[in-house]
Amino acid sequence: MKKIICSFFLVAFSLTSFSQGNVIVQKSSKYNDLALTPPMGWNSWNTFETNIDENLVKETADIMVASGMAAAGYTYIVLDDGWMAKERDANGNLVPDPIKFPSGMKSLVEYIHAKGLKFGLYNCAGTHTCAGYPGTRGYEYQDARFYANLNIDFLKYDWCNTEGINAKEAYNTMSNALKTAGKPIVFSLCEWGDNQPWDWGKPVGNLWRISGDIYPCFDCEFKHEQGNWSSWGFMKIIEMRKNIRKFSGPDHWNDFDMLEVGNGMTNNEDRAHFTMWSMMSSPLIAGNDFRKMSKETLAILSNKELIAVNQDKLGIQGFKYSAKDGLEIWVKPLSDGNWVITFLNRSDVTKKIYFDWKKEVIRDVDFNIEANFDTTVYKIIDLWKNKELGNTKKNIYF
């Protein structure tokens, strides 16, 4: 069984010849500082696809608040593809589906805001969305005004039906349209990483997808019967893009896609998934059915220690420190000079851990940060058990 073994929080409490002067806080261009930490929330697509309506959205918002998820940091309720009618009106305006949303979208947005939450919608840079609804191509400024009038807070902007369109230009046009409309809206570039959005997305949006869609499995590729495309297990996505962590940071995040926690994987795989998304500073956008959420799933999604790792203000994405015989060690520096170290079992058999701290020096060459366990003693905290495990004077073995 594939499983996460443990994730340790290393707190420096005795320093000799150690300087935090090497810790560099990333500077980032801001679009109204809307996403200084990775956005957290819920999106309808993973579980419901286009089978959405206002009752589902209201129930999800109610549970987000009542369950404590909102208090844990989950803020956005995002309606994905399928919220609009199949055709625009006579004036070219988008029309929320009157059957799915009989009270109107404006009323639904107000309901979400009254809960202390934020609301998001979906559209596409192409002529049609991925599910065949009206896309935004040629309507960018009109649609931006529509979103501003609705008072939404988040726009996921997909990349289907975009033949002949330049990605950078298309997303820049929509970004300018949103700013011209006057309502600050978090802009999610769902471009799948095909045109390297990390190279040009920083002044355009607040987050960008780095891959195709996620699939609820540890390390698989799911080939769709219709069309020449695949969805990916969460470890496949993590390994898909190399050397892009330096582009991610406050207000401009590498987006590893929505979470599949609670969607059919084992409890250990769910914990591994949530741990790695936290380590990678990915947006934490839940994709499960809150109405059927188990206590175990809620506990994973609400783990305040891992959420704190994800939301650390330094915003540096973690990286793989070592890998041997299916056992990987991932590390992530934090804003206070401390570190998170995750031991991840990629194999199908139980692995023993042995880690000699004094023989290890972790160097983050992208951000010029170092952890030297020979000169610095760290207190060790297991983030899943919320339990202190001594310090780095003693080696780890279990």
Where are these regions (language model features)?
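Bacterial Sec-dependent N-terminal signal peptides
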Residues: M1-G21
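N-terminal module-boundary/linker segments of secreted carbohydrate-active enzymes
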Residues: G21-K58, I63, I185, L344
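Structural recognition of the beta-strand scaffold that forms the well-ordered cores
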Residues: P38-S44, G73-L79, K118-N123, D153-D158, ...
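Aromatic-lined carbohydrate-binding/catalytic grooves of carbohydrate-active enzymes
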Residues: T60, M64-G164
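Glycan-recognition surfaces
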Residues: V186-D289
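Catalytic cores of secreted or luminal carbohydrate-active enzymes
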Residues: R271-S322
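Carbohydrate-binding surface patches
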Residues: W277-M280, I285-G287, A323-I369
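Intrinsically disordered, low-complexity Pro/Gly/Ser/Thr-rich segments with frequent PxxP/GP/PP motifs
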Residues: K385-F398
